[in-house]
Amino acid sequence: MRTISPASIRQHFARAVMPLVVFLLLLAGGVYATNYSLWINGRSSTAQPGNHADFTYWGPASTAAGVNKKSVNWDGFSRVSDQNYRVRDALDCYCTGTNWCYIAAHSAGNLQIGYALSLYGGTARSKKNATPNASGVCGNSDGGTQTGWNIKWVNVAAGAGGGSELANVGSWAVKDPLTSDLKTATARALYDHNQTRAKWFYMYAGSKGTLYSGVLPGQDDEAVAYHSAGGVSGSGGAGFCNPSDWFCNDLTMGTAANEGGKAKWSYHSVKFRDDGEALNHYTNSAWGGVVSKVRADMAANAN
């Protein structure tokens, strides 16, 4: 019978327990990864700025919408540049250090995440502890910094990154500062839409328009046209439609150039096009409209 020496026993034991020891040390030091799902609202009169637990804008907080979901509440009223710090605070909180984020944005929330990534995604960010105070600001974790944020991808429902013709012609009977940013020429010049820091923007475009939205070119969801919701590049809007419309160039799926040759912005891909003309722009505080498609994707894949 083979005799196993005490030294050999100690060696095998050390190999067996070492992974457990390392794991426990990392756990004790708080060095473990957590994924979060951040939801960035658009125009709103109900958002509670800095309150990452309030989902009034979206719908019931109990609804599945991605792992560890947080509501990135900015005021939904001010200029993008004036409220973007709220978005950056949330990104710092949950998307630094060992933590990673999935992002979902709606309407003008598209401008907010695009603005943050383009202008601040290459800057030094302090690593945070994912424990926000009442203002939505987290404390530092280990005193270290990193460049930009840990983001897996960005889902955009009814994106207003390209602006809306309704803002151009004053169809919205409001005078809030945000409307100025939503004019098509302004929205498209607000930041470099091609600079996403290599993060993919997956676009979800609804097309249940109405007669009063006739000012919007091509297919629309009552508030934004396909040129915006589909991430079509350029300094101004143009008409893009579903394949069933013979009198308008198609908004193509994926990253391919649209019919007529117009390209999408870099790292922008159309994931959903509302060929059935069934989904409008609005959540109705019930995860409704085209947001329903993004919510379903986040519930299934943001984990």
Where is each model-derived feature located?
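Short, solvent-exposed loop/turn segments at secondary-structure junctions
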Residues: 43-45, 110, 160-162, 208-211
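Serine-dependent carboxylesterase/thioesterase catalytic core
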Residues: 35-37, 85-200
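N-terminal secretory signal peptides that target proteins for export/translocation
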Residues: 1-12
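C-terminal catalytic-base region of ester-bond hydrolases, centering on the histidine
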Residues: 195-303
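Active-site catalytic motif of lipid deacylating hydrolases and related acyltransferases
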Residues: 33-103, 162-165, 172
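Bacterial N-terminal signal peptides
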Residues: 17-28
